[in-house]
Amino acid sequence: MAIFAATYKEGDPVWQSFLRYKTDYSKQFYFFVIGALIALFILLTDSKFFSATANLWYAVGIGVLFLVFPFHSRVKGTESIIRFGGFQFQPAEFCKVCVALALAKYLSQPETNFTKTRSHLIAAAIVLFPALLTVFQSETGLALVYCAFFIVMYREGLPASILIIASVIAALVIATIVVEPNLLAIGLTIMAGLVIYTMRRSIRRRRGILLIVISLWFVCVGIQRFAVPFLFKHVLQKHQVERIYDLFGKDNPYSKGTDEPDVVSSSRKSETQSSYNVKQSKIAIGSGRFWGKGLLKGTQTRYDFVPEQRTDFIFCTIGEGFGFVGSIVLLGLYLVLLFRIITVAERQRSTFSRCYGYGVASVFFFHIAVNVAMTVGLAPVIGIPLPFVSYGGTSLLTFTILLFVLIRLDADRQMVLR
């Protein structure tokens, strides 16, 4: 319905277009039918099949990702699409199913001891290898989705210290964007000095503590002064850096081609494409008010003021058409779905099924949280679909497979799969 509201043009023959495969909503309808058939096939499959072939599916997923490089078609800046006649297939979407199965398979192996660093590194490699291939296909948004699988590892015993370190690094990157570089370096130095002063008695007894504090100071300053600028200048693409700076209301200071950030210009915000998208999205959501304008009555979405309103920004179509009430109902349904997935995962006797269930919940949560936050300006524009709502055949089929494999595993939850 949201795709129909976002793409319907007045005067279009609705029922005829559904049969002719010419409009986005008719194409999505056909993918819905295909998804229903795949779901039926999954429900009729032996649950042992998924654990037995998990590694094979991972190999297939990686192989298809490699096929993208020689056979890709460039679509809207991304090189992650393979065309089959009139169809487009995005392997990075499908590979999420493969990673969920492979990670669950590895974590459920009797020989896997997840208290050891070696097991942590192997599990991380299973997740990060396809993510790295996806980055090379100019699809950073989908690559970030794979990071959601670290939630599964945390559930299975990944030390909280690793997540804390990752959070501190993320906070330091944000501070590098928001705070003037020299001021941030001074602040880090003052913090290190305060830590040394507070722990002065312990330092007298153990000199190694002083070495650790100084080393951490060097690491933080190195990240702030060298690692983050290198990442923004030489790793991420220009439009990706602009989206990150747009989130904090600043211009991209590296856009002039210099290695040193232009701090003065970054403090004055000019409108970019991504900031325009978010601005129009918030206008559309705000114009819906409490009850919404009604189906096909939204002005922002009906007249294409919001770019990508059928895919990445489809939540604004719901916000304008059905208002605050409709948005809350949709988010409530998502919360119920996530809670149900986690409940199903926790009641599994099999480690494989439990890990797979948490993998499904993690992927759904990341997509929902980031997509909604993106449309209201609380997250950078990274371009990931809203599950079961955004236009896209590959994403619809991927979410369908993820969910129905879990349903099939739950049907045999008394079995212990390995």
PLM features: residue spans?
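Transmembrane helical segments that form the transport core of multi-pass membrane transport proteins
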Residues: 257-259, 264-271, 286-303, 307
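Gly/Ser/Thr-rich beta-alpha loop segments that engage phosphate groups in nucleotides
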Residues: 79, 143, 288-290, 294-300, ...
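A juxtamembrane structural motif centered on a specific transmembrane helix
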Residues: 348, 371-418
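Glycine/serine-rich anion-binding loops at beta->alpha junctions
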Residues: 86-98, 138, 289, 293, ...
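A conserved mid-to-late transmembrane alpha helix and its immediate loop/hinge
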Residues: 278, 282, 291, 295-344
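Membrane-interfacial loop-to-helix junctions in multi-pass transporters
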Residues: 69, 118-121, 274, 304-311, ...
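Hydrophobic alpha-helical transmembrane segments of multi-pass inner membrane proteins, especially
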Residues: 3, 10-270, 316-376, 401, ...
